[in-house]
């Protein structure tokens, strides 16, 4: 999967089509300020949507709860297509925010700090906590 930010080029639809023509799956990355409507007419070209629930740049930031509504909106857009499009969330994912993301419609989570905090002896406990048990 090759994912691009809508803001990174002038023709998102052409970029997504080209990625797929070259044999890769295509993804779109949403920064916190990116509106979901930007992909409204190109859902057939998308295989993955990644919602950044923090402003990209460094780990350990707090989850932006305002992104839950965006996840819900994107889930509705995906469901309307009848296609399987992964909906992934990255940024501030913790044992507390993971269930909120899943309830909002996410199908995959990226967790860095929540997995690695406390060092290798804590990884298993941290992963269990993310899974809800």
Placement of each model-derived feature along the sequence:
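Catalytic cores of alpha/beta
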Residues: 34-46, 91-109
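Conserved, mostly hydrophobic/aromatic
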Residues: 49, 74, 90, 101, ...
């Amino acid at each position: 999967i090759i994912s691009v930010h809508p803001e990174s080029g002038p023709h998102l639809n052409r970029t997504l089509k080209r990625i797929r023509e070259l044999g890769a799956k295509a993804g779109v990355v949403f920064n916190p300020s990116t509106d979901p409507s930007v992909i409204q007419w190109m859902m057939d070209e998308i295989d993955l949507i990644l919602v950044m629930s923090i402003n990209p740049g460094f780990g350990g930031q707090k989850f932006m709860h305002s992104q839950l509504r965006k996840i819900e909106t994107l889930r509705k857009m995906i469901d309307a297509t009848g296609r399987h499009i992964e909906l992934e969330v990255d940024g501030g994912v913790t044992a507390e925010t993971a269930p909120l993301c899943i309830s909002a419609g996410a199908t995959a989570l990226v967790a860095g700090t929540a997995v690695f905090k406390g060092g290798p002896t804590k990884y298993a406990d941290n992963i269990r906590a993310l899974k809800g048990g």
